[in-house]
From Swiss-Prot:
Heterodimer of A and B (AC P14420) chains; non-covalently linked. The A chain (acidic) is non-toxic, and increases the toxicity of the B chain (basic). The A chain may act as factor stabilizing the complex structure and hence retaining its toxicity by preventing non-specific binding. Upon binding to the target membranes the A chain may dissociate. It comes from Vipera ammodytes meridionalis (Eastern sand viper). One of its GO terms (cellular component) is extracellular region. It comes from the Eukaryota. This is Acidic phospholipase A2 homolog vipoxin A chain. GO terms for molecular function: calcium ion binding; calcium-dependent phospholipase A2 activity; phospholipid binding; toxin activity.
């Protein structure tokens, strides 16, 4: 769920998720449209695509099992849907961590009205 994802983000980026990523670019946060603005926003676009492939549970509210082991995020559910959601969040958190140097304050609280270009395909 989004709280668990926020915990993963904090572990991988050192940034508090709500303030840094809840309304960032065209895809970080609830929903998304247009073209991702930078590498950080592309991480969120990829997560949205991943969520789109998870059909049997609600990715933003599903509670899954995970742990941190030697700095790695380890998903632990036997339930395939919950594990898939965890893996989507895990991949996005790792991506955000790998691209933390591209984080641009100009895209914080970015208005969705600027996100008018055609979206890439998942």
């Amino acid at each position: 769920n989004l709280f668990q994802f926020g915990d993963m983000i904090l572990q991988k980026t050192g940034k508090e998720a709500v303030h840094s990523y809840a309304i960032y670019g065209c895809y970080c946060g609830w929903g998304g449209q247009g073209r991702a603005q930078d590498a950080t926003d592309r991480c969120c676009f990829a997560q949205d695509c991943c969520y789109g492939r998870v059909n049997d549970c609600n990715p933003k509210t599903a509670t899954y099992t995970y742990s941190f082991e030697n700095g790695d995020i380890v998903c632990g559910d036997n339930d395939l849907c919950l594990r898939a959601v965890c893996e989507c969040d895990r991949a996005a958190a790792i991506c955000l961590g790998e691209n933390v140097n591209t984080y641009d304050k100009n895209y914080e609280y970015y208005s969705i009205s600027h996100c008018t270009e055609e979206s890439e395909q998942c």
